[in-house]
Amino acid sequence: MRVALGIEYDGRQYFGWQRQAEVDSVQAQLERALSKVANEPIRVHCAGRTDAGVHATGQVVHFETNAIRKDSAWTLGVNVNLPDDIAVRWVKIVDDEFHARFSATARRYRYMIYNYDFRPGILRSGVSHYRGNIDADIMHQAAQQFVGEHDFTSFRALHCQSKTPFRSVHEVNVTRQGMYICVDIKANAFLHHMVRNIVGTLLEIGLGNQRPEWIPQLLDLKDRSQAAPTAKPNGLYMVDVTYPERYELPKLALGPLFMLD
């Protein structure tokens, strides 16, 4: 039997999604909890691996099991065995052809910026703090140059393992709500550090250190060293994964919870 789960987590205590020897990860905690409920070893496959300190409200995973359980066992039962900063949001029995990663047609991330002179006390692990007068409108205008299929070599991590640097960005929106700025980006898939590198570049433009035409120049250069520093991890959320409608997966509010969808 193949089971799909919707997962959310606060990534600050973990060395990313992927299971690793000698360090804690979201995957390891989830597999441990699922194995207890199933009474057999469980290995999960995710829609997209997140880095250390990165959060998710819309991660999707699937796993194979011989255990026959009620849906409540895969939600409430698993949650009882998880740390407080990881939670199952929904469960769905899926066809054997479904794959959390390969069946996905798009992923969506939100990057939350707290733009104020002084650091935040509340939500400090869920936003990235940047001082200065950040122009969200010019960031939004500049961000439209990322839409479409491009070679994102200038916006991938130096050790990114993807075989191709090409990705198709479906939409990017930058909005401000008081002291909070949200960079919302959807694409068919993302390269390692791609969202944070895009945000770092948009911040340089929003702060007035660069002009919007810098973006097409960076895309043409295909040189990571020429772009802005990578934005901090703690403001980044994986908020949604898109699948064909035939799978009938649940759709919940994107989050993070303090955002209005």
From Swiss-Prot:
**Pfam families, alphabetized:** PseudoU_synth_1
Checking CDD domains in the record gives: PseudoU_synth_EcTruA
| InterPro entries from the UniProt entry | PsdUridine_synth_cat_dom_sf, PsdUridine_synth_TruA, PsdUridine_synth_TruA_a/b_dom, PsdUridine_synth_TruA_C, TruA/RsuA/RluB/E/F_N
Which one GO biological process term can you cite for this protein? Answer: tRNA pseudouridine synthesis
Task: Please provide, alphabetically and separated by semicolons, the GO molecular function terms listed in this UniProt record.
Answer: RNA binding; tRNA pseudouridine(38-40) synthase activity
Binding-site residues for substrate, renumbered to this chain? Y109
Record has tRNA processing as a keyword: yes
The record lists the catalysed reaction(s) as: uridine(38/39/40) in tRNA = pseudouridine(38/39/40) in tRNA
Q: What class of enzyme is it?
A: isomerase
| Taxonomic superkingdom | Bacteria
Keywords associated with the record: Isomerase, tRNA processing
| Active-site residues per Swiss-Prot or TrEMBL entry | D51
Tell me the subunit arrangement. Answer: Homodimer.
Q: Do you know which NCBIfam families this protein is assigned to?
A: hisT_truA
Which family does the similarity line name? Answer: Belongs to the tRNA pseudouridine synthase TruA family.
Q: Identify this protein by name.
A: tRNA pseudouridine synthase A
